[in-house]
Regions:
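Bacterial Sec-dependent N-terminal signal peptides
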Residues: 1-23
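OB-fold and OB-like single-stranded nucleic-acid-recognition modules
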Residues: 15-146
Length: 146
């Protein structure tokens, strides 16, 4: 009887969904819609929020940033004070929930080139970056990758 219970526990443990938390422990509650966040940002400089999406890519050098598809948009997400990193590989296409601060920011040519280098872009692609970009940015306090 003890063996049957032990086997059932092992099977049930193997069936649980794997969730990985990075940074601050967050929950999947109160996930905002990106369009409503963008609308709210028109009235304030930044907003604390929780969003979700699908990981497109992560920094292959350190895991210090990720690109996430949220609906029809793509967000570039960095992590608060470089206090944590996400996996450098193996998470593309996975669902992600992230909590932190959304705001508009100017991304310099130097930073864009740095991120392009990290992502393994060609020299020709990097040389085509010549203008600063003003875009929606996100600094995450915590991340859940499912």
């Amino acid at each position: 009887m003890k063996n049957i219970i032990l086997i059932l526990l092992i099977i049930l443990t193997g069936c649980t969904q794997s969730t990985n938390n990075y940074g601050e422990i967050i929950t999947k509650n109160n996930i905002s819609n990106l369009l409503s966040v963008i609308s709210e940002l028109k009235n304030s400089g930044q907003i604390e929020t929780t969003l979700s999406g699908k990981i497109i890519s992560t920094c292959p050098k350190k895991g210090c940033w990720m690109r996430v598809e949220t609906g029809n948009d793509t967000l570039f997400i960095k992590f608060k004070d470089y206090e944590f990193f996400v996996p450098k590989s193996g998470v593309d296409g996975k669902e992600v929930v992230f909590k932190g601060t959304a705001f508009y920011d100017t991304v310099s040519v130097a930073d864009q080139k740095h991120y392009a280098q990290d992502a393994g872009k060609s020299k020709e692609e990097i040389e085509q970056i010549v203008d600063d970009q003003y875009k929606l940015s996100f600094i995450a306090d915590g991340v859940i990758i499912e």
